[in-house]
């Protein structure tokens, strides 16, 4: 888990959860370049530990679905009751067939591969802050 936060800034904080380190770091760079503070976690269990002390600072979660230890769906089921206003964006390169309940995704599912501009547009849409205009036309996953 890595923290990119600068305690002197008021940038939106995003939790990024993915077991693929290369992709996680690449997406963290994309988000950081767009002005977001990023907290990284390698699986759902690590993500739950990471958010334990954030107290309202977290604005969005981006999580892979298929991960060891605790997958993204299990993480979201544990996370949402404690943070009901924080949206969760699921990303996956495979069939998300882990769940039969479409409510698990809330319509926030982005399939890999995607471009950084598509990713940032979805982040901005979920944050509702106009961030969808950020980003460049680069493939990231």
Model-predicted regions and their roles:
Residues 112:
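A Lys-centered signature of the CheY-like receiver
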Residues 42-46, 70-75:
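Acidic catalytic/metal-coordinating carboxylates
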Residues 64, 92:
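Active-site residues of response regulator receiver
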Residues 40-60:
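Acidic, metal-coordinating helix/loop segments flanking the phosphotransfer/catalytic sites
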Residues 94-98:
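Negatively charged, flexible loop motifs adjacent to catalytic sites
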Residues 107-109:
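Conserved phosphoryl-transfer motifs of two-component systems
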Residues 67:
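Receiver (REC) domain active-site loop signature in two-component systems and cognate sites
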Residues 1-15, 21, 25-28, 52, ...:
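Non-catalytic signal-transmission and effector/linker regions of two-component phosphorelay proteins
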């Amino acid at each position: 888990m890595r923290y990119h936060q600068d305690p002197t800034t008021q940038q939106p904080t995003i939790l990024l959860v993915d077991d693929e380190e290369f992709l996680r770091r690449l997406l963290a760079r994309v988000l950081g370049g767009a002005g977001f503070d990023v907290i990284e976690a390698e699986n759902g269990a690590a993500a739950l530990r990471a958010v334990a002390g954030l107290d309202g600072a977290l604005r969005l979660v981006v999580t892979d679905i298929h991960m060891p230890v605790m997958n993204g769906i299990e993480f979201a089921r544990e996370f949402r009751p404690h943070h009901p206003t924080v949206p969760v964006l699921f990303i996956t390169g495979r069939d998300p067939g882990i769940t039969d309940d479409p409510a698990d995704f809330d319509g926030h599912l982005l399939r890999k591969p995607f471009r950084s501009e598509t990713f940032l547009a979805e982040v901005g849409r979920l944050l509702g802050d106009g961030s969808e205009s950020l980003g460049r036309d680069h493939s990231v996953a």
